[in-house]
Amino acid sequence: KMHREPFSVSLDFLMKLRHGGHQVIAVGTTSVRTLESLYYVGVGIIEEGEAKDVDQWAPYAREYDYSLEESLDAIIDYLKARGETSLRVGTRIIIVPGFRFRVVDVLVTNFHQPQSTLLLLISAFIGGEWKPIYEYALAHSFRFLSYGDSSLLFRAE
């Protein structure tokens, strides 16, 4: 079971994200999980009227027909109606191949250990290209984990 990551996102950031019209660059896998969880928080508000934590398997439970804009609008309206300036919830979301990315376009991250859930996220994000990238990193003695080398990854279409 994925651990819960609490997060807080400001109303100002949500409004910029909603109306930005530009690529979203996440720094780190926790940022990816946070940003992608926003969609499911918005869906929860649309369908149940409240902002709740995102369950580990929520993205895979069924098809979701709401647009990202509808989801973000729901969060923004929810916060404004309550006079709140930030969203505070948590996520247990796991991102594996087959995940539909709705928010993040580019990821800056370090290299993750083989057979980790974070490598599953990388595989979901860039598709089959993860393997040659990691083979290159291993062959050239790149450092892994928190103080290791980093990579700039673009989402597979």
Regions of interest found by a model, annotated:
Residues 1-157:
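Surface-exposed, charge/polar-rich loops and edge strands
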